[in-house]
Design a protein with these regions (language model features):
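Short amphipathic alpha-helix that is part of the acyltransferase structural core
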Residues: 1-34, 47-55
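Conserved acyl-donor/pantetheine-binding loop and adjacent beta-alpha core of acyl/acetyltransferases
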Residues: 59-87
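Conserved GNAT acetyl-CoA-binding A-motif
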Residues: 111-114
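Short loop/turn motifs at secondary-structure junctions and domain boundaries
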Residues: 36-42
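Residues in soluble alpha-helical coiled-coils and helical-bundle/repeat scaffolds
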Residues: 25, 94-95
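Conserved acetyl-CoA-binding loop-helix of GNAT-fold acetyltransferases
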Residues: 90, 96-109
Length: 114
C-alpha cells in the first residue's frame, strides 16, 4: 500500500527544516527566512506522514518563477514547459517504506499535461 500524500502546511515547518538540514550537502540548507521566501513560488509542496511530523516531503516549481536555483535557471533557459523537482527528502526512520516513490509518483501525476 502506497503512503498517503498531502500538501505541506506551516505546521510542518519545524520538522521540514530539521529533515532538510540533515541532508545538507545533498540539498541546500534552509532556515525559516528561506522557507518563507520559497513558499509563494512553489507549484507543489507535498508531504507523507502526520501533519507537523512528516516522514518525507518534496517540492516543485513551474516555469516563469523567480526561483533561487542555478539548476532551475538552466532548466528555464532550455525549456518552456516543465515541472522542476527541487528536492525530495525522506526521514531516516521512513526509508525503505516507499515514501520517496509515493512522492515521485504524485509529482508525476500532477505534472501530466503541464
Amino acid at each position: 500500500m502506497s503512503p498517503d500524500i498531502r500538501d505541506l502546511t506551516t505546521a510542518d515547518d519545524a520538522s521540514l527544516l530539521a529533515l532538510n538540514n540533515v541532508e545538507v550537502p545533498r540539498v541546500t540548507a534552509l532556515d525559516e527566512a528561506a522557507l518563507k521566501r520559497y513558499r509563494p513560488v512553489l507549484r507543489d509542496a507535498l508531504a507523507v506522514g502526520a501533519e507537523g511530523d512528516p516522514d518525507g516531503f518534496c517540492w516543485t516549481v513551474g516555469p516563469g518563477t523567480d526561483y533561487w536555483s542555478a539548476n532551475y535557471a538552466w532548466t528555464s533557459r532550455h525549456y518552456s514547459r516543465f515541472v522542476y523537482l527541487d528536492r525530495v527528502v525522506v526521514a531516516p526512520r521512513a526509508r525503505g517504506r516507499g515514501v520517496a516513490r509515493a512522492l515521485y509518483d504524485a509529482v508525476s501525476a500532477r505534472a501530466v499535461g503541464t
